[in-house]
Amino acid sequence: MTTKTSIAKALTLAAGLSLASMQAFAGADAALYGPSAPKGSTFVRLYNATSAPAAASVGNTQIKQVGAQASSDFSFLPGGDYTAQVGGKSVPVKLASDKYYTLVNSNSGSPKLIEEPPFKNKQKALVRVQNLSDQQLTLKTADGKTEVVKPVAANGRGEREINPVKVNLALYQGDKKVGDVKPVALERGEAAVLYVTGSGNALSPVWVTRPVASN
């Protein structure tokens, strides 16, 4: 075997191994993250704020059952007008392409569709408050000394980019603490969304984050 032939065979083998490695990594990505969404898709997930399990559908797209005060991962479908259904309750929804939404199932009335602007800063973590209660709320450190997210009006949204950290937080009305929030580990490049449902003295704050496994 000549030197040129040996080099050619070695290069062919290396190319084959590289292709196999790329295919293996692609397969691993598909297993971890699911299939890629086509261009122009819209993304929707379910947050079940009730005390009983619930499943949902948006058009022909089924969202698997989640437990009480739990959430699904995002499912994708073409943008457009649909009927969203959770249990026996339904609501018409308009889903724009390249947008993210959370369908909230609560004990009060029809499901609500909430837009979730995507977070793309890989160096920071995002804390977002989706305040679906009937009162203005501020997210602070548990001792009340540091404001994490500025006051958020009833049925409003507020957010802040922060450095990744694990911190104890609480909801306040002015200087009055109205409830502690479960600790959450804020990871770089991730968004932790605090959904606040309920009213008066019966507020229910729950962190909604993407689960490890997708639907």
UniProtKB/Swiss-Prot annotation:
A Pfam family this chain is assigned to: AlgF
GO BP terms: alginic acid biosynthetic process
One GO term describing the cellular component: periplasmic space
Signal peptide: 1-26
InterPro entries named in the record: AlgF (IPR035422)
Pathway: Glycan biosynthesis; alginate biosynthesis
Keyword field: Alginate biosynthesis, Periplasm, Signal
Entry's family note: Belongs to the AlgF family.
Name of protein: Alginate biosynthesis protein AlgF
